[in-house]
């Protein structure tokens, strides 16, 4: 369920020049609809709705499928969580890197070295990045980032990955 941070994300993206913002309402209840109503008032925003919560994985797939069907000429998509943890300028940088490198998925990464980072978050990220490196042979500093720039040619594949909840 979103809060006022969703509008901070939307307004930041619009100020940064993004003109096609897709938001998935993943089964939010009536008490949490105001942020979606406010976002929908912007011409740059399209709201896609799940009547019941289906999970982050399904929400992402819904957006990918929408883009495949309705935005065939895009370079790709940038996924951003609705909690305003990513700066619009960093979102733009990821988008530009993806456009410059259309064979690669670009991941934003958070700084886990600060004193304000909960030990649980730091530990969880260290475990998952170690598992990812062991399983895939690739070093990624933030495996749980919500900031991803994905070239359009990978959207069909991404929409068919097994799992719906963001396993």
Predicted features, each with a name:
Residues 37-71:
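Conserved donor nucleotide-binding strand/loop of the catalytic core
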């Amino acid at each position: 369920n979103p809060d006022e941070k969703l509008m901070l994300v939307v307004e930041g993206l619009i100020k940064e020049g993004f003109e096609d913002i897709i938001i998935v309402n993943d089964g939010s209840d009536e008490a949490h609809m105001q942020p979606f109503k406010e976002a929908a008032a912007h011409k740059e925003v399209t709201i896609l709705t799940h009547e019941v919560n289906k999970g982050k994985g399904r929400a992402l797939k819904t957006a990918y499928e929408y883009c495949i069907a309705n935005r065939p000429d895009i370079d790709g998509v940038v996924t951003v969580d609705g909690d305003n943890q990513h700066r619009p300028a960093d979102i733009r940088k990821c988008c530009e890197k993806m456009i410059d490198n259309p064979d690669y998925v670009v991941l934003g990464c958070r700084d886990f070295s600060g004193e304000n980072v909960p030990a649980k978050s730091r530990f969880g990220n260290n475990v998952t990045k170690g598992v990812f490196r062991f399983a895939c042979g690739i070093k990624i500093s933030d495996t749980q980032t919500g900031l991803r720039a994905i070239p359009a040619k990978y959207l069909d594949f991404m929409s068919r990955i097994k799992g719906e909840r963001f396993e």
